[in-house]
Regions:
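Charged, helix-prone or intrinsically disordered regulatory segments positioned adjacent to compact structured domains
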Residues: 2-85
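Charge-dense, extended regions
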Residues: 81-139
Length: 139
């Protein structure tokens, strides 16, 4: 349904990383939709549903960091929850060629090199030990 009001178009939380990216493209930012997806993922109790939430590949964007980050999110959530790692996360386009440290964390490089979960580190994305933390997380 086409609507002129963007907030109406996103009344529900995204239930896939593809939906995160598609919604984010429409409003110009992905972070809030990723947080909503994580809340939805963490409250879902059925492992099959969780696996389906990670299975659908988000289209590649013009932002290689975002493409790699979404793959790291999917792989990390799959590993943490004993789910199969989606094949799409292993594509070369889902890996960075140069290390990336989020802005404002330059002074923490040494710590981030050690703490970054494997799914992020192997894509050369260096983040804290629990990059997908959400206060309401159940898993």
């Amino acid at each position: 349904m086409e609507t002129g009001n963007k907030s109406e178009a996103f009344a529900g939380r995204p239930r896939s990383l593809k939906a995160v990216l598609m919604c984010g493209r429409m409003v110009g930012e992905v972070d809030s939709f990723l947080r909503e997806f994580l809340d939805e993922f963490y409250t879902e109790q059925d492992p099959r549903e969780r696996a389906l939430m990670l299975a659908e590949e988000p289209p590649l964007s013009d932002n290689e960091r975002q493409d790699a980050y979404l793959a790291a999110v999917a792989e990390h959530l799959a590993m943490r929850n004993h789910l199969g790692i989606p094949d799409w996360t292993q594509a070369p386009s889902r890996f960075l060629k140069r290390p990336f440290f989020p802005a404002g964390l330059e002074s923490l490089k040494a710590i981030l090199l050690m703490e970054s979960p494997a799914a992020f580190r192997r894509r050369m994305i260096f983040v804290g030990a629990d990059p997908l933390y959400r206060p309401r997380r159940a898993a």
